[in-house]
Amino acid sequence: MTTTGNSLDRRSRGKLLSGIPARYAHFGSLMLLGTTAGTLALMSPQRANAFNLYSGTVNNQNVEINLETTVEYSTFYRVNDPSDVLLNNVNGDEGDRNFRHGFVDNTFDALPVLDMKYGNFGAHFSGELYLDTPYLGTNKNNSPSTYNPYTTGKNTDFTSATRNINGENAVLLDAFVYGGANFGADDQQTATLKVGRQTLLWGQSLFFASNGISAGQAPLDIIKAQSLPNAQAQQIFLPVGQVVATYQPNQILTFQAYYQFEWAHDTFQGVGAYFSSADILDKGGERILVGPASDPQVAALYRIKDVSPPIDNGQFGASVQATVGLYDLGLYALRYDSKAPSLYDGAPMPNGQANNVGSYWLVYPRDIQIYGASVSTDVGPANVAGEISGRRNMNLVGDAPFASATYPGSANAGALYPVGDTLAAQASAIYASAGLPLIPGGVSYAAEIAMNHLITVTANREMLAPGRQGTAAATEFTITPNYFSVLPKLDISFPIGITYDFLGRSEIDQTMNHGTGNFSFGVSATYRTTWIAAITYKDYFGKADVSLNPIADRGYLSLNLQHTF
């Protein structure tokens, strides 16, 4: 499967599964499952609720300009007390302490999407403006001795970086132009080119974004992944600048290739955000406390400049996809730089702090390769899909931080983190039943099983994190009873979702740990397709654990209101 085009809004909170998973809904047609989005009909997605700014003919070419805007309000209420186990982690307690009880989110969000089309050419732009009021004031942190940031001055203040990533910002998402042509006998051949910020996703990932082939193609929005119940893979990828070329010689084959001229890391929670479990990474990460918390001048490692891959390092890929009868098949090869960091530490750099005993920085591994295949077909009334992929030069879960004799250290040859060759596989099914007794709209089901396996360690085996296994697996499924036209133009659904890691503590994915997971249930009402209201309860399986289950105490009740025009 290939998915391209517009990104969904970064922080959409209450959007529950309505029974049509993103594998289908992204295109709006079941017949397009598994085919390329490079065909001319798919280059500019038709948005059913868009406001038409202009429609006409110029130089015998159809011209359309459409603007669609979604506005949204969401709020979260914490339902669990902070865990003592997690509060005792001096380098991961800010999120718990800042939001000890009560309302933890109060977000106003706007997502404008502009599409312009001139014949077979066009442009697509989207952005987001958001305001989350709890991050604009003070918080409830009551532990100045374990407060990691040092530039704010007060433990009840958020860092400016956290305010920007969680509190208020205006973000450009998609920004690309495209063009294409039909040629050959009866115009059956198609070639398209898209240039700019966009998402291109290969494979058949349904829920487990970081485990699939598409994990190498775009950064993940961890903020959305942690705040949207049962987030589907395509909902949490972010666009990057790239060139995408697609050639369709006939109705069976599609050849596609891309080159990315922009690299971006995953969007992590800001330090001290409600779902933050590490006080040292990314936005707002400033120091690691290494001495007794009771010491007012506690010893610390101070953060210095991170090591990111150079823009010209080369991230690219190619695929061959085919529709053979009822089967959609794909072969893929790609090379990418990691969007998630490893942690290095070393000698102190002068910064004027008396308790400075060392430095730390984030290093993003480079030159990872993925080779994979996917298949999708219908089995009776259900759609069944799967993929398998191997990764070379993959960074593994290590016992960080990794001590470096020199700064900046290497993110390629000579890496300090463990590296290996791995295998990943996923299988999923989607099914929507006919009407049932007491459920006239039927029930929608979506499920996926994901596994990963460490084939061999090629470097730094001694740095593997202890207590983990070479094979791990997890599952996620949703069940959604639907009631259509309860009142004129009003549909109601009751989505239920469960994620559970049932095998192993992965040496490849540090979030896949046996006995952990989450569950959610709620009610969603849709009026005239443009108004949505949802209430959701979400909580977590397993005992709180600093390494294995660091947000186990962050259960919440949420309300979401949304309108598209």
PLM features: what roles do these ranges have?
Residues G119-D279, A474, L503, M512-G517, ...:
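Outer membrane beta-barrel
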Residues E94-R100, T159-N164, L228-A231, A273, ...:
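Extracellular loop and loop/strand-boundary signature of outer-membrane beta-barrel proteins
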Residues N49-L67, N80-P82, L114-A123, L136, ...:
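Short loop/turn motifs that connect adjacent beta-strands in outer-membrane beta-barrel proteins
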Residues Y73-V79, L129-T133, R197-L201, Y259-H265, ...:
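Transmembrane beta-strands of outer-membrane beta-barrel pores
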Residues T530, I551-F565:
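Outer-membrane beta-barrel "beta-signal"
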Residues T69, A110-M116, F125, D174-G179, ...:
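Residues on the lipid-exposed face of transmembrane beta-strands in outer-membrane beta-barrel proteins
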Residues V63, N91-G95, V104-A110, E168-L173, ...:
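Residues that define the transmembrane beta-barrel architecture of outer-membrane proteins
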Residues I65-Y73, G119, A123-G127, A191-V195, ...:
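Transmembrane beta-strands of outer-membrane beta-barrel proteins
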